[in-house]
Curated annotation (Swiss-Prot):
Disulphide bridges, residue numbers: none
Organism phylogeny: Bacteria, Pseudomonadati, Pseudomonadota, Gammaproteobacteria, Legionellales
Similarity remark: Belongs to the NnrE/AIBP family.
Residues the entry annotates as binding (6S)-NADPHX: 73-77, 148-154, 177
Co-factor(s): K(+)
Cofactor annotation comment: Binds 1 potassium ion per subunit.
Catalysed reaction equations from the record: (6R)-NADHX = (6S)-NADHX; (6R)-NADPHX = (6S)-NADPHX
GO molecular function: metal ion binding; NAD(P)HX epimerase activity; nucleotide binding
Protein name (database record): NAD(P)H-hydrate epimerase
Length: 270
């Protein structure tokens, strides 16, 4: 049986375990910001640092990493990861997809993402604008920070081409929140998707990681609660008994967990 942890208490990942749709996850995020006064920037920084912590724990010998960042909040998490990776002695390279470095905030980019992008630039982290003909080098690990839960509709052709290119690498792929191309609520592929070696997700378990194609494409799952108060999970109820979660859905998953009561990552074993 697989487990994930909620405030130090092991719970089975099965039909009785609360998991969340994207709309419910967004409610949790709103509560964190509005009721518990945790800013969007703070949440972004907590998640990016947690992702880097897991990366180091899971692949301790990796040095050269390539982080593919979109222009949304998922990309912001990738920028935070890049900064943390440099502090920990790694050599991060950021590939900017659909945007580029700018001294003024680009249209449609959140202030927090722009802040973290500029922080990377100021710290001397390599920032490259991605193009289909550019040489991606020889990374030892790839980080997928393209869309996360923010994917709507099908993956655009130029992104699909990038995903196919990345899938040809024979190195580990760490997805932040949700593998690009996987619907975080349904687990279905949005035209094309990037299969991850592991996915780290935050605040709550997303249903799409546990069902349909998402179960396969997410690889191992790491979960970090971002220091969320226990009361928040009572305010927004997850899916406790879902017909979408049958008895065979989650039992083949490796799920790492960490919360504010724990210092390190722990792994559930079937």
């Amino acid at each position: 049986m697989d487990y994930y942890f909620t405030k130090g208490k092991p719970q089975l990942v099965n039909m009785k375990t609360p998991v969340y749709l994207v709309t419910q996850f967004q409610q949790l995020m709103d509560l964190m910001q509005n009721q518990y006064q945790v800013s969007c920037l703070e949440l972004m920084q907590r998640s990016g640092k947690a992702a880097c912590d897991f990366l180091v724990y899971r692949w301790p010998k990796v040095k050269k990493i390539s982080i593919f960042c979109g222009r949304g909040d998922n990309g912001g998490q990738g920028y935070v990861l890049a900064q943390q990776a440099k502090k920990m002695g790694m050599i991060p390279t950021v590939w900017q997809v659909g945007h580029q470095m700018s001294m003024s905030k680009p249209p449609q980019m959140h202030e927090e993402v722009w802040y973290e992008m500029n922080s990377c630039h100021q710290q001397g982290i390599l920032l490259h604008t991605y193009s289909p003909d550019i040489d991606l080098g020889d990374p030892e690990l790839i980080v997928d920070a393209l869309f996360g839960v923010g994917l709507y509709g099908h993956v655009r052709p130029e992104i699909a081409s990038l995903l196919q290119r990345l899938q040809q690498f024979t190195v580990p792929i760490l997805a932040i929140e949700v593998p690009t191309g996987i619907n975080a609520s349904t687990g279905e592929i949005a035209g094309n998707a990037l299969a991850a070696t592991a996915t780290i997700t935050f605040l709550c378990m997303k249903l799409g990681l546990l069902i349909n194609d998402g179960k396969i494409y997410s690889g191992e799952i790491a979960f970090d609660d971002l220091l969320a108060p226990e009361a928040i999970y009572q305010q927004v109820k997850g899916i406790e008994k879902s017909s979408l979660l049958d008895s065979s859905t989650c039992f083949s998953k490796k799920i790492w967990y960490r919360n504010k009561t724990q210092k390190g990552w722990q792994l559930s074993i079937n």
